[in-house]
Amino acid sequence: MRIKSALLTAVLSLLAFSTASAGKHWVATWATAEQVVEPHNCPPAPGLENNSIRQIVQTSISGKVVRVKFSNEFSQGPVTINAAEIAQAATAGASSDIVAGTEVSLTFGGSKSVTIQPGQLVTSDPVKFPMGNRQNVAITMHLGQASSTSVTGHPGSRTDSYLIEGQGSDFSNAVKTAHWYIINAIEIQAEKKARAIVVLGNSITDGRGSTTNEQNRWTDNLSRRLLANKKTKRVSVLNMGLGGNCILQGGLGPTGKSRYPRDLFQQEGVKYIILFEGVNDLGGRGDAISKANQIQDVYKQIIAEAHERGIKVYGAPVMQFKGNNYYSENHEAGRQQLNQWIRSSGYFDGVIDFDAAMGNPDDPAQLNPKYLFENDYLHPNADGYVQMGNCIDLKLFEK
């Protein structure tokens, strides 16, 4: 009888949304790139198993009907969600508080629980959950079986998450950790003109140097500008940056060439792609000229697949790193070669030239000193991320 009841609930849920979905489509309003979480970024005590975690994200564009994706794609064991809720968060991550009366339970095929096998991604049933632009959202999971040493997640959340023992709802004394686990995307049911930008990037896109709980990565600043512009106010921004990521080999997380089919083409409603990778490849061991050529080949493949899907692709030249340990004459020559190709090859539908916008006027091979994060000569600070968000021509996303 329980199985029949769950099936009936699922059918009724689908019927309830069939009218609302007429003439609409799903668009991701928030998403994150995932990997096997490194040991030092794994959940702290009390851990995930048989405990509860509340995670805060800030979405892009508004919606009234949503669904949430949860991922166990990189873990070795199953994850059981006993129950999950979505609610409006009171802050952008500085506290675990939620706005009273906004909690909505999530279901999976009509059931409040779901077990996600290794390698799987699950999507909740659609629910009515009104949220505005740049909405702070809390996703709470009450977990059963779940490893804290082999876990799928996003280490560089730049946002606090909150972990408590047991299956309760009082997070006032929760353990904080600045990582996301298991949550993958939030999608809205939207009118046809709503669409998404997805960015493939590394730690600069992931927001290294931005401020925890302030949501001030360059992609956040771009999103705010898009929302304020009449012709782009229904364009979301999906950040697929991974710290330490390489396109070709090595680095942290799946390589760009292995993850792009999932991180770019499995996102809902994508109309535009921004490719902004390469610095970790060029700055590593080996000949940077050869690497630049190999990166071009990967970019050509991504562009071809995107164009087959009707998606525009914008290239972003690699920013300066003179003064960082990555720098050498060979590495700089590789950067210049790749950047020249991005600007002039004609493969891209447009160029977003962070390199031109962020350079030191007295030494174009170096980041502008006023934009340096901790003088590492690689990552921008919060002001630098504002400059990056501001230098982008919004006309690229108007059609």
What would you call each of these model-derived segments?
Residues 9-16:
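Bacterial N-terminal signal peptides
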Residues 30, 49-55, 78, 82-94, ...:
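Conserved SGNH/GDSL esterase-like catalytic core that processes O-acyl groups on lipids
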Residues 283, 319-399:
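Catalytic His-Asp segment of secreted/periplasmic serine-dependent ester chemistry enzymes
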Residues 299-307:
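Surface-exposed amphipathic alpha-helices with a cationic face
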Residues 1-8:
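Bacterial N-terminal signal peptides that target proteins for export
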Residues 2, 21-200, 210-212, 231, ...:
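N-terminal secretory targeting modules
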